[in-house]
Amino acid sequence: PYTEEALYHLVARVCQTQDVLGRQILIENPSSYLQYVESAMPEWEFLAELAQRSGCGVLLDVNNIYVSARNHGFDASAYLRVIPRPIVQEIHLAGFTVNRFDNGEILIDTHNQPVCPAVWTLYHQAVQRFGQIPTLIEWDADVPDLAVLVAEAERADAILEERHAQAA
């Protein structure tokens, strides 16, 4: 759960890891499928506090934000707005699958589909907020033809270039 106790424990482990490695590490926001009743703060606040207290950076997975937002009913754009700009050092994009059942549906971060239009929109917002951050598209299963992968990468590059042109 996202509690002060869990944060204290994780900060200590992140600091220990960074001390052993002699360098900063990045922590990735997860995709989530359940919520803890005991949580005292939202994920984005926990992540920002972890980075601030430990000095680690954040690998911001935009697809994970979208998946979790859909699964739990929060505003994905609001998540981006509260993450401090300096802590984001890498961005991930991916695809997901929708599992339907009697009472609804759940999105699963499967890395086997193209990036969906809503995630591209969220990525555009992320680039507007955080700038030209190195971006990786994850595709681990049901890998398509190279042309599909290249097209996804080119779309991400175009969004980054658009941001660069605006900043110039």
PLM features per residue range, with description:
Residues 1-57:
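Active-site acidic/histidine proton-transfer and metal-coordination neighborhood
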Residues 4-7, 71-130:
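Gly/Pro-rich active-site loop or hairpin
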Residues 10-18, 44-51, 80, 120-127, ...:
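Generic structural signal for well-ordered alpha-helices
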Residues 25, 61, 91, 135:
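Conserved, mostly hydrophobic/aromatic
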Residues 30-32, 63-67, 93-98, 140-142:
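Active-site beta-loop-alpha junctions enriched in small/polar residues
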Residues 35-52, 68-81, 147-150:
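Distinct, well-ordered alpha-helical segments
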Residues 134-140:
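Conserved active-site loop/cleft motifs that coordinate metal ions or position small ligands
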Residues 146-167:
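C-terminal helical cap(s) of enzyme catalytic domains, especially alpha/beta-barrels
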